[in-house]
From Swiss-Prot:
Biased composition (Low complexity): 147-160
Principal location class: membrane
Class of enzymatic activity (EC top level): hydrolase
Phylogenetic lineage: Eukaryota, Metazoa, Ecdysozoa, Arthropoda, Hexapoda
Gene name, Swiss-Prot/TrEMBL: Fur2
Tissue: Transient expression in a subset of central nervous system neurons during embryonic stages 12-13. Expression in developing tracheal tree from stage 13 to end of embryonic development.
Membrane topology: Single-pass membrane protein
GO terms of molecular function: serine-type endopeptidase activity
PANTHER family: FURIN-LIKE PROTEASE 2, PROPROTEIN CONVERTASE SUBTILISIN/KEXIN-RELATED
UniProt entry tagged with the keyword Glycoprotein: yes
Gene Ontology CC entries for this record: Golgi membrane; plasma membrane; trans-Golgi network
Protein name: Furin-like protease 2
Function: Furin is likely to represent the ubiquitous endoprotease activity within constitutive secretory pathways and capable of cleavage at the RX(K/R)R consensus motif.
Region of interest (Disordered), ranges: 1-42, 139-164, 424-456, 1660-1679
């Protein structure tokens, strides 16, 4: 009966009628069931489907008339139990087998955990990497794939890309124009590389509809590495009439070309030298078609190296689009005590009165944060992210930074957005016009249009630098920072606009904050264009005087479209700090995008009506008090400015921070704990938590400034590129299918480009897959960290390709690069895929350092007790991949180059690194390891480790060659194959090709292991492989002495000494010089040049011209602002200022004031007066009275309040405002009434601007240099162009001071003159002090040497030096030894001894080591093997059993597969069998290994990586599950006849009572009673025996009877008005059976008992048949 029939009249039916029931398993449904273990469903059928299917079957069994109960009874309870448990067990076992088999298949491709042959170690063969593989993982397919995959012929043709350059013996040339000559795997170092911007995009799309990728011959390249990927033009681009061109010949040539072809040269693009913007009036301003004619005209010019017609870009602000949400209300949120309320008037001003008017609401309640109210600013209480108002009292922890005095002073931040309101009362005091520009309007005023749509930039600016301690809005994070804005989003946006914004005044602006980007629509893949890319690179290489501009970017608001910020080329860049958002409660906001490029998080808005937003200033042109603030700033747009403000605090704490230092600080100090309520946190390989939502956690301002105070700049950045994997691989279109491929890299080990400590990792991918939004891409590092490079984007259904897109991940920060990297491409989307995709190419680019990057200031470490043990007590020190398990003397905190980032020259050279061989090879090309693998131990031979670290047995044969020991003098003790230096096994000095030599020839140098390697192409002689190691130069090159590089032209800051073909550095502060270091031709930014010297300000009697030079004033002027005698500001002695002139004597009506040095006007009526202003002669009709004042003739008889009118001839009253006068107007007063002041013949209540009160009642004018003053000698504001210093207005500040927006502020105490407040902004030093990199020192600091022109930087090889170049070192950095003035790294057979600062030879048994003695080995001399338990080189034990018993035995149990000591193989690296000449074996040997028995070859499980440990645990769990289920099945099988389960209700209903039975009539009757459902299950306790059923059930039913038959039967029918609350119906047969068995539902025997009774249970929906002894049947009814 249905649930819905609650009150209908329902007929149960005649008791004498028997419904016929059909078993669905024996009917049509039998065809759908393939086995007895389940129906037609998958093994992963959801539970809700199983339940629904069972209910349907039961319903069909009850109502299908095709099957009788007797037929169904044939399936016994035991058979059912067996079937159910056997099927369950079968499924579990099958799942475990599939899982184990999958791990066996997977492990050879990822971690090599399970292997049965040495060949499997190198050559991965499996389903996941085979193009023909399917998703059915069975053993037959495994064998098939192994048989069909051919082996590699040699190690060089391995299918897994191994970045190992042992066979690459030549240095390939680097094409200085493009990338054509770049060697795969080469890497560069930023500190001295050419930033080559000539990149050609060759990755076109499969179809024009996908996207039109512009081919560029001159894109931007960063040391040969394009970091941004292919830039694209929209499918329907709107072209403008502007053309960007690159003309290296300069502006004059650009003007000529523009004029020739009818263009107008609009000038240079931002700070990008030789890049100009052309405009043509005959080209449409907006067109869907490009102008090929004008493009061709520009391309025809040889001087035009690159050009691009500009097209509009779609760029969106990243504030929250709440207007699209139905729950959004634009009301202001106001604070009440104990809660928040919604103000119905959105324009209500933020005042206590307005707050009290609002009614209390219980909807939003947060903790009271009144204890944090330390600012009087009215909106500070709403800035919950600053005052502990987030959940659990958390915030951005800005308070400790403020308490230390860091408020952003001296730091300049610019907001790249839609402009900022410069006159906003909460911003005006901090506004910096030099950090601002209006690109849309092409002027210097960034004020946006006041149309309601351009508030974004102003709001962001308020978060950073809103003025504190005033009565407007709130406070900024860095409330004393200088704030500027760029108006760029309030009009068309193109590549030129972005480049201009990103390169605006990079020497002045420290931090750029941007809260915009491409569309966050879940389908766009876009990034910066070629000019914006160049602006980024120019910023990090040249901004902030070489320390690099800091770019802070909002990660994106595409969360509701499941967008990924890895598809945004701005946040996906290594140059930007990508910032995400967290809600007030510490959760992920609805708009957040997840990606692997996010570095950290700040608080922002959350769910409208639940989480608070950000309070800041607001744009309002009318400055209405109720419109200039807001509490509704939202999205990641609000997060990025908060991060920029925190970075400003850190920059104030340490102005020397580079752009990379800032990223390190953010990574090291961000806190995961406040955001750990949100899932998704993972530990990376150096035990640092990261999240795809929040990066490394919530930024911590207090921790950042504390660490910044101790921070020393990180070492130069190295860039290591892997080989490109160009093998096409199929991406299966089936849902859930995975393409897995891997790459073995060595991190460019052994080269100058080595990366041991990772920062950023880029994975450049080219693939085709439609739709590409289905894809999820994962990258796993050798340390087991998995980073998701791309999440599924369901809206990305139109495009099908990624063209060389560089997916960035910051999750590997601090890990090692060396080892196996695994890339997985997963089809995780539900959209249909018509054909498989193709992974065409992928490549890894590693950014990082070769030495420990974190090196705190040594003086702080030594003086502070809590910092003396950095590894144990400093909270900022983390373990790194390279120093885990290493001794303390490696990877220390010593600063090898404190000034590594001061001189950073761009466009100098392009590095061509090369990789030395890790060990010396024999002259015939055979590896020595293979040649002597069978020899005896090193101890028995008695050899010592030579420079080549080789030993050889006397009788060892290499093929058919016998090793001799009577050899050439150049052969070492290893012997030779014959006479002559070409037959040596190894060399005693150096090796050149196949010959041993005593010294390397010119244009080569000996590398670390004694091989003569060629110098860089520009070097004639060198000390290393790089272009910055030249000692002398190749022909037609100039030697840049201090950099040790060779160039064809001297770079800026150098002059050419043609006599000795060198480039000599100019003196400090010179940007360029000529013929002599002190003869400057241009100066650094913010400096001026006078007589070819650079100063912070022009000297006296000079003025600054437009070209930043100083010119002399006119001879009459002391200071001036122009060249003529009418441009004077102050005068020389004996001259007086009058109308911008300097006069010897003042004109009539003026007198010379010797105190003011000005010509002051005489009193009214005076013709001449003395120097003190006393009249000596009056004008006509004026008379000199007794007080020496001139009065009108005839006024002697007038009273004091009258004047004499010569027209009327009588006295007339003065104006009412005057006390006395000489005329009727209010401008004719000569004195004033009490409480009034006389100002220029007027009586006023107070002096106006430019006057001060003198003698109590007179307003005297300020000095002509002052615009405001409080007395004659105390100016408070100066005229335009003058500087205020201690109340005096001057043309230039005094020595020791600098101009800070018109006010002279003190320089750093060691500076004599300066350009700013920082330590490194000195321009001149006190006498006897030395200037080095902008700082003044008593002596040249470490890393500099004293020259005739100040301190010059040492070569980067040196720690200290006494001259330029790599041969002038006097001490070396750690791990380098001084040898004849040259710092050389220790050989592979040596270790660095810190006490003597020298390289010492390792123990004889060690090939490489980290210390003295035999227990410090890192590598061993064959045939010894490294025992990692004690770092000792030992031989293999001959008797393994004896070795296990004898712990002191100098041997180890060797692995039969690898030949190494057991448990010593390095995780993630390849293993090879010692003695094997190839890294690979044939397919026959691999196939044979599967068929060998266990005695022939051992099947080894190695726990050498995280994945293998997980594999072992998983296998053990599966085996345990199988064992447990086997035991359970055995027990249940034995007791199956006695078990009753809740789902199967076997119930033998007992007779109710003998007394009741006796009262019944003897004639056959039927009885029915209803059992009320009281919420219990009467068999949940389990019926253990028939006796318990007989004894208990009847009593229980009696207690629950609610209806009994009363009266006579009515045709064996009864009616129920409602089935509500009826649990079951019992049918009782009394007396002998009167019906025939075949027509009865119930058959009663002679005793009145039921024979066959059908029970329908409402709880289980299953019918059961009772035993014949039952007397009562129950039919449950579904109520």
């Amino acid at each position: 009966m249905s649930n819905t029939t609650r009150s209908s009249r329902v007929t149960i039916g005649r008791i004498g009628t028997t419904p016929q029931i059909t078993d669905p398993w024996s009917s049509g449904l039998e065809k759908q069931r393939p086995s007895r273990c389940g129906g037609p469903k998958s093994l992963a059928e959801p539970t809700y489907r199983k339940i629904g299917r069972r209910k349907m079957m039961l319903h069909m069994r009850v109502h299908d008339p095709g099957t009788t109960v007797t037929q169904r009874a044939k399936e016994t309870a035991t058979a059912k139990l067996n079937r159910i448990y056997l099927c369950t067990f079968n499924r579990m076992a099958q799942s475990c087998i599939y899982f184990v088999l999958f791990l066996v298949i997977l492990s050879p491709n990822t971690s090599c955990a399970l292997r049965s042959s040495a060949g499997e170690t190198q050559n991965y063969v499996g389903i996941l990497s085979n193009d023909s593989a399917t998703t059915t993982y069975d053993v037959s397919s495994l064998h098939s794939s192994r048989r069909t995959n051919p082996p590699s012929s040699s190690s060089s043709s391995s299918s897994n890309v191994d970045v190992d350059y042992r066979n690459d013996r030549e240095l390939h040339k680097v094409d200085l124009v493009g990338l054509g000559g770049e060697r795969a795997g080469q890497a560069e170092t930023i500190s001295g590389g050419k930033y080559d911007y000539n990149y050609e995009n060759t990755h076109t799309n499969a179809s024009a509809k996908d996207e039109i990728v512009e081919r560029q011959s001159n894109s931007l390249d960063f040391d040969g590495v394009d970091m941004f990927g292919a830039f694209s033009i929209p499918e329907e681009a709107i072209y403008t009439n502007e053309f960007a061109v690159n003309i290296p010949a300069g502006k004059q040539m650009a003007d000529v070309i523009a004029t020739k072809h009818g263009f107008i040269n609009r000038g240079q693009i931002g700070s990008l030298d030789n890049y100009y913007l052309f405009q043509h009036h005959h080209v449409s301003k907006r067109s869907l078609r490009s102008s090929r004619k004008h493009q061709g005209a520009l391309k025809s010019e040889n001087e035009v190296k690159w050009m691009q017609q500009q097209h509009e870009k779609v760029r969106r602000k990243r504030d929250g689009p709440y207007q699209d949400l139905p729950t959004y209300s634009p009301y202001n949120l106001l604070r009440q005590h104990g809660g928040y309320v919604v103000d119905p008037n959105p324009h209500l001003s933020f005042s206590p009165e307005s707050i009290s008017l609002a009614s209390h609401s219980q909807r939003m309640e947060y903790r009271d944060v009144s204890s944090h109210f330390i600012f009087p600013d009215p909106l500070f209480k709403e800035q919950w992210y600053l005052n502990g108002g987030a959940k659990d009292g958390l915030d951005m922890n800005v308070g400790p930074a403020w308490q230390k005095g860091y408020t952003g002073k001296g730091v300049v931040v610019s907001i790249l957005d839609d402009g900022i309101q410069t006159n906003h009362p909460d911003l005006a005091q901090n506004y910096d016009p030099e950090a601002s520009f209006d690109i849309n309007g092409n002027d210097s005023d960034p004020t946006p249009q006041d149309n309601g749509d351009n508030k974004h930039g102003t709001r962001c600016a308020g978060e950073v630098a809103a003025v504190a301690f005033n009565n407007f809005c709130g406070v900024g994070v860095a409330y004393n920072a200088s704030i500027g804005g760029v108006r760029m989003l309030d009009g068309k946006v193109n590549d030129v606009v972005e480049a201009q914004a990103l390169s605006l005044n990079p020497s002045h602006i420290d931090i750029y904050s941007a809260s915009w980007g491409p569309e966050d629509d879940g389908s766009t893949v876009d990034g910066p264009g070629p000019l914006a890319r160049r602006a980024f690179i120019y910023g990090v290489t040249s901004g902030r005087q070489g320390k690099g501009s800091i770019f802070v970017w909002a990660s994106g608001n595409g969360g509701r479209y499941t967008d990924s910020c890895n598809c945004d080329g701005y946040t996906n860049s290594i140059f930007t700090l990508s910032i995400s958002s967290a809600t007030q409660a510490g959760f992920k906001p609805w708009y957040l995008e997840e990606c692997s490029s996010t570095l950290a998080t700040t608080y922002s808005s959350g769910t409208p009506g639940h989480d608070k937003s950000v309070a800041t200033v607001d744009m309002d042109g009318s400055l209405r008090p109720d419109h200039i603030c807001t509490v509704e700033h939202t999205g990641t747009s609000a997060s990025a400015p908060l991060a920029a403000g925190i970075c400003a605090l850190a920059l104030e704490a340490n102005p020397e921070l580079t752009w990379r230092d800032m990223q390190y600080l953010v990574v090291y100090t961000s806190r995961p704990a406040p955001l750990e309520k949100e899932n998704g946190w993972t530990l990376n390989g150096v035990k640092r938590k990261y999240s795809h939502k929040f990066g490394y956690g919530l930024m911590d301002a207090g921790a950042m400034v504390s660490l910044a105070e101790q921070w020393t700049s990180v070492p130069p950045q190295h860039i290591c590129k892997s080989r490109e994997n160009n093998e096409d691989r199929k991406i299966d279109g089936a849902y859930g299918s995975t393409l897995s491929t891997h790459m073995d890299v060595n991190g460019c080990a052994g080269t100058i480009n080595e990366v041991r400590y990772l920062e950023h990792v880029q994975c450049r991918i080219t693939l085709r897959f439609f739709p590409r939004g289905n894809l999820r891409i994962l990258l796993t590092s050798p340390m087991g960290t998995t980073s998701t490079l791309l999440f599924e984007r369901p809206r990305d259904i139109v495009k099908s390709n990624f063209d060389d897109w560089p997916f960035l991940s910051v999750h590997f920060w601090g890990e090692k690069a060396e080892g196996r990297w695994t890339l997985q491409v997963i089809n995780g989307g539900r959209r249909r895929v018509n054909q498989p995709g193709i992974l065409s190419k992928w490549q890894l680019i590693f950014y990082g350092t070769s030495t420990q990057p974190m090196r705190l200031k040594s003086e702080l470490l030594n003086s502070s007790p809590q910092l003396r043990s950095p590894s144990s007590s400093n909270p900022f020190l983390f373990p790194s991949a390279s120093n885990i398990g290493q001794p303390a003397n490696e990877g220390g905190n010593f600063n090898t180059d404190s000034f590594a980032s001061y001189l950073n020259y761009q466009n100098i050279f392009s590095s061509a690194g090369s990789d030395p061989e890790p060990a010396t090879a024999t002259l015939d090309g055979q590896n020595v390891t293979a040649a002597i693998a069978g020899g005896s131990s090193a101890e028995s031979l008695g050899f010592t480790a030579s420079a080549a670290q080789l030993v050889a047995a006397p009788e060892t044969r290499d093929g058919d060659k016998k090793i001799l020991h009577s050899c050439d003098a150049e052969c070492d003790s290893s012997g030779c194959y014959g006479r002559g230096p070409t037959q040596c096994v190894a060399c005693s000095h150096y090796r050149l090709d196949n010959t041993c030599v005593s010294r390397c020839p010119p244009r080569s140098f000996p590398n670390q292991v004694g091989i003569c390697w060629p110098c860089h192409d520009t070097c004639e002689t060198c000390a290393g492989a790089g272009p910055d190691s030249c000692l002398t130069c190749a022909p037609a090159h100039l030697h840049v002495i201090d950099l040790a590089v060779c160039l064809q032209f001297c770079p800026d800051g150098y002059f050419e000494n043609s006599r000795n073909r060198t480039c000599v550095p100019c003196e400090p502060n010179c940007a360029s010089c000529q013929d002599h270091p002190e003869y400057c031709t241009s100066c650094d930014h913010h400096l001026v040049m006078h007589e070819h010297k650079c100063y912070s300000a022009c000297p006296l009697d000079t003025y600054e011209t437009e070209d930043n030079k100083c010119a002399f004033c006119h001879s009459t002027c002391a200071t001036c602002n122009g060249p003529t005698d009418q441009d004077c500001i102050t005068c020389r002695s004996s001259r007086y200022a009058w109308q911008n002139k300097c006069l010897i004597s003042c004109p009539d009506g003026f007198y010379a004031d010797k105190k003011r040095l000005e010509c002051m006007p005489c009193q009214e009526g005076c013709k001449t007066c003395t120097s003190n202003g006393v009249c000596s002669e009056c004008l006509q009709n004026w008379t000199l009275n007794k007080r020496d004042k001139c009065i009108v003739s005839g006024s002697e008889g007038c009273s004091e309040s009258e004047f004499y009118s010569q027209v009327e001839g009588q006295c007339r009253p003065c104006h009412a405002s005057c006390g006395s006068c000489n005329g009727p107007a209010d401008t004719s007063c000569t004195s004033c009434p009490p409480n009034r002041l006389l100002e220029q013949s007027r009586c006023v209540s107070g002096c106006r601007e430019g006057f001060f009160v003198e003698a109590g009642s007179l307003c005297s004018p300020c000095l002509h240099t002052c615009s405001q003053c409080v007395s004659r000698t105390n100016c408070s504001n100066c005229s335009k162009g003058l500087e205020l210093q201690n109340g005096e207005c001057r043309t230039t500040c005094a020595d020791g001071y600098y101009s800070d927006r018109g006010i002279c502020a003190k320089c750093y105490l060691s500076c004599h003159t300066c350009s700013g407040p920082r330590r490194n902004q000195c321009v001149q030093c006190p006498a006897g002090w030395q200037l080095a990199a902008g700082e003044c020192h008593p002596e040249c600091p470490e890393g500099f040497y004293k020259s005739d022109f100040g301190c010059q930087k040492c070569h980067h090889y040196c720690k200290t030096c006494n001259d330029a170049g790599p041969l002038a070192c006097t001490s070396c950095p750690p791990h380098s030894m001084l040898d004849g003035g040259l710092c050389m790294e220790c050989l592979s057979s040596q270790y660095y001894d810190t006490t003597s600062a020298t390289c010492k030879t390792c123990h004889d048994s060690c090939r490489s080591c980290f210390g003295p003695g035999q227990f410090s080995c890192k590598g061993c001399v064959p045939p010894l093997h490294l025992d990692q338990l004690n770092s000792q080189c030992v031989s293999c034990c001959q008797n393994q059993t004896l070795a296990e018993k004898t712990s002191s035995a100098a041997c180890c149990n060797c692995d039969g597969e690898t030949g190494e000591c057991k448990a010593t193989s390095t995780g993630g690296k390849r293993r090879t069998v010692v003695g094997s000449g190839s890294a690979y074996k044939s397919s026959e040997s691999k196939h044979g290994s599967f068929e060998n028995d266990g005695n022939a070859r051992e099947f080894v499980l190695r726990l050498d990586s995280p994945l293998t440990a997980i594999t072992a645990i998983a296998v053990a769990i599966c085996l345990l599950i199988i064992t447990i289920f086997s035991i359970i099945f055995a027990v249940l099988q034995r007791n199956s006849n006695h078990v009753s389960r809740n789902s199967v209700r076997y119930r033998k209903i007992a007779n109710t009572s003998s007394g009741r039975r006796k009262n019944l009539s003897a004639k056959p009757t039927s009885d029915a009673r209803f059992i009320f459902n009281i919420g219990e299950d009467d068999d949940t306790d389990g019926d253990n025996s028939d006796d318990e059923l007989d004894g208990n059930v009847g009593t229980d039913i009696n207690n629950r009877i609610v209806y009994d038959r009363k009266g006579n039967d009515h045709g064996h029918e009864f009616y129920i008005e409602s089935t509500n609350d009826i649990d079951a119906i019992e049918f009782h047969c009394n007396g002998a059976g009167a019906q025939k068995a075949e027509t009865q539902l119930q058959r009663c025997n002679a005793n009145g008992d039921d024979d066959d009774i059908l029970h329908y249970d409402r709880h289980t929906n299953a019918e059961r048949k009772n035993h014949p002894s039952s007397t009562t049947s129950r039919t449950n009814i579904r109520s």
